[in-house]
């Protein structure tokens, strides 16, 4: 069990087993209220730390092409700066203020909050757009929240983003691929649209490095009215937070099971500490669901430890109703426990959090261009992330952060900053986006952090093999442009259902593999009349199925607009398998001869991989398969697997799989 102590104090004694097995250092804690109490929305806005910088922000935006705002989470920069800009006239004359977020859930939450503060309905003066969902009005929306990726897609129709007067790139420190592409393109747009203002906002970003990136290296030609143009040199403004002191506690020894340790820590906080909500950081939906189940079972079996707990998950796949529960006030006499991914680090502000439990891990993608394998792995977080997590505990009053790792590890081993996603990901989707936007010299593109040439070259090779690029590395017509228009990863072929439960697999499992199983579930949902009761009986997520329907209809409209003729495969599942092969041919694997453990090897790179236990093909072990994604734990596991005929590989990608090379493997 985890044993916590506060640095600089004497090592505490061990508890007896009957006391719970997890040791906390008792420390003074003021349970007095924050003093905020009830206030009007306008009063609440004025109490935010960013309010006293309102005039400075508006002056800098007026006088500089780019303004970099560094502000702690909870300072109010995300919700207030777009409103300040609108109040100053930047949305007059039909212009729009854009604010991008790296995550869909954050887009929805922030748009709802700003609309509430302005006293308007979401979708009118304040709107948002995420993939497959547009809640905005072209004639009425003046403040628009959207993901970085959606704004990139808008560039395909309007390369200079002419309707926007100010574009605010929020949470820029997360350095997603879409964020880095967007920053590079916005820098180019500014040269054509000097009137465009950029606001780069972040909690932890290295402001000097970002300023250097936007600093123009070329002197602008002086012309009439030059004195009215904004300065090219970026302005930097640091906004204070309103945080209280947060006591940091570490474990003495590394924990063996961070999910179990997190659950134990929550129970002891609830048993020993004053009122206040708890925020737990875990790695993903699987870990979160396990922790929610463990805490819920504890609440049912042990009233002493867990009465009054409200246990809520928080990750990107939640329905809107489930999200609303997380943001709703905690009832009197209750304690809310929010178990979240790193989405709660900076993108979202949760009121009432006094205690944070930090596992020290998050899920990240890592790509090896040599083996051509991209893994979603559980990886250690950076010091910057750890500080952000701890800061969530001190928003309204003094708080505590319990880190499930040692102080020595934090000081001596944890990296200072995370690796930008562009430097650790498969770049196929990135390259096709740039090509569609007219950026042909992708190796010479102005990146905030340059990706490896090897990853770029591998992406070009794959796109050429798919028939998306021609011999001159330009998009083919019409296929290349059609693929670029569809708002999905080039590898994505539709999972159908997020929660792969054993009961559903027994009813709908297909011998061909997971993709056909998902298709069976989809057909069953339609035949039931899209019934929520049917979903409940079959252990299927009804909200996920509704989203599948919405996405299918939008993709259908896009296909018709692009002139793609849609044909049903009827009952011929071989066509489905061939379609998956055509899109995922680079992910082909062959079962190792005489393997008793179900070991496969990838055709490109000869990496050892195994079918994930959640797949309907687990322990079936067809000779040849294609997977959608890899997950690394003790082994590399294939998710969403389908069986194939190896001859389809050379049919689908003759440039990628040379017949003479593949024949010896097949036979």
Residue spans for each PLM region:
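N-terminal leader/propeptide and maturation segments of large enzyme subunits in energy/redox metabolism
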Residues: 524-543
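Extended, well-ordered protein cores
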Residues: 16-17, 640-642
């Amino acid at each position: 069990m985890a044993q916590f102590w506060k640095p600089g104090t004497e090592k505490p004694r061990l508890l007896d087993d009957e006391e719970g097995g997890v040791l906390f250092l008792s420390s003074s804690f003021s349970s007095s209220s924050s003093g905020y109490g009830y206030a009007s929305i306008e009063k609440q806005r004025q109490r935010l730390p960013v309010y006293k910088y309102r005039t400075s922000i508006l002056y800098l935006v007026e006088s500089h092409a780019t303004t970099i705002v560094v502000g702690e989470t909870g300072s109010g920069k995300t919700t207030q700066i777009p409103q300040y800009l609108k109040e100053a006239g930047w949305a007059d004359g039909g212009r729009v203020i854009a604010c991008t977020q790296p995550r869909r859930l954050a887009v929805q939450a922030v748009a709802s909050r700003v609309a509430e503060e302005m006293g308007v309905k979401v979708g009118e003066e304040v709107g948002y757009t995420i993939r497959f969902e547009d809640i905005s009005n072209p004639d009425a929306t003046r403040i628009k929240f959207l993901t970085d990726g959606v704004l990139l897609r808008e560039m395909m129709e309007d390369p200079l983003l002419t309707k926007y007067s100010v574009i605010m790139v929020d949470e820029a420190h997360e350095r997603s691929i879409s964020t880095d592409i967007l920053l590079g393109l916005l820098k180019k747009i500014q040269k054509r649209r000097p009137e465009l203002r950029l606001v780069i906002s972040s909690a932890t970003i290295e402001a000097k490095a970002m300023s250097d990136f936007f600093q123009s290296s070329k002197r602008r030609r002086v012309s009439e009215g030059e004195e009215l143009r904004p300065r090219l040199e970026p302005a930097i403004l640091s906004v204070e937070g309103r945080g209280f002191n947060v006591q940091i506690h570490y474990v003495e020894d590394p924990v063996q099971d961070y999910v179990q340790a997190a659950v134990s820590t929550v129970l002891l906080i609830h048993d020993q500490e004053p009122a206040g909500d708890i925020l737990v950081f875990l790695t993903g939906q699987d870990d979160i669901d396990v922790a929610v189940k463990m805490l819920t079972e504890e609440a049912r079996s042990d009233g002493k430890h867990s009465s009054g707990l409200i246990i809520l998950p928080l990750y990107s796949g939640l329905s809107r109703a489930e999200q609303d529960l997380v943001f709703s006030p905690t009832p009197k006499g209750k304690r809310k426990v929010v178990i979240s991914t790193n989405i709660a680090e900076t993108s979202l502000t949760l009121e009432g959090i006094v205690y944070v439990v930090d596992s020290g891990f998050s899920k990240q993608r890592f790509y090896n261009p040599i083996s051509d394998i991209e893994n979603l792995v559980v990886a250690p977080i950076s010091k910057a992330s750890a500080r952000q997590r701890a800061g969530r505990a001190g928003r309204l009053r003094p708080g505590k952060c319990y880190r499930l790792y040692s102080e020595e590890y934090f000081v001596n081993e944890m990296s200072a900053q995370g690796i930008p996603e562009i430097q650790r990901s498969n770049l196929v989707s990135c390259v096709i986006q740039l090509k569609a936007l007219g950026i042909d010299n992708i190796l010479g593109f102005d990146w905030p952090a340059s990706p490896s040439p090897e990853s770029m070259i591998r992406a070009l090779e794959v796109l050429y093999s798919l028939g998306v690029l021609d011999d001159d590395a330009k998009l083919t017509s019409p296929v290349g442009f059609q693929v670029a228009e569809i708002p999905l990863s080039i590898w994505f072929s539709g999972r159908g259902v997020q929660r792969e439960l054993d009961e559903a697999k027994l009813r709908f499992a297909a011998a061909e593999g997971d993709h056909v199983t998902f298709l069976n579930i989809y057909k069953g949902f339609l035949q039931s009349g899209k019934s929520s009761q049917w979903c409940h009986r079959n252990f299927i997520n009804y909200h996920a199925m509704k989203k599948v329907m919405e996405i299918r209809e939008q993709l259908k409209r896009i296909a018709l607009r692009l002139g793609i003729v849609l044909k049903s495969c009827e009952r011929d599942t071989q066509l489905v398998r061939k379609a998956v092969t055509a899109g995922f041919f680079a992910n082909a694997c062959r079962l190792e001869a005489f393997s008793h453990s179900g070991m496969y090897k990838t055709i490109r790179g000869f990496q050892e991989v195994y079918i994930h236990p959640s797949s309907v093909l687990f322990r079936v072990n067809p000779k040849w398969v294609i997977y959608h994604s890899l997950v690394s734990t003790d082994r590399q596991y294939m998710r969403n697997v389908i069986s194939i005929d190896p001859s389809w590989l050379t049919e689908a990608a003759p440039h990628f799989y040379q017949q003479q090379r593949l024949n010896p493997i097949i036979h």
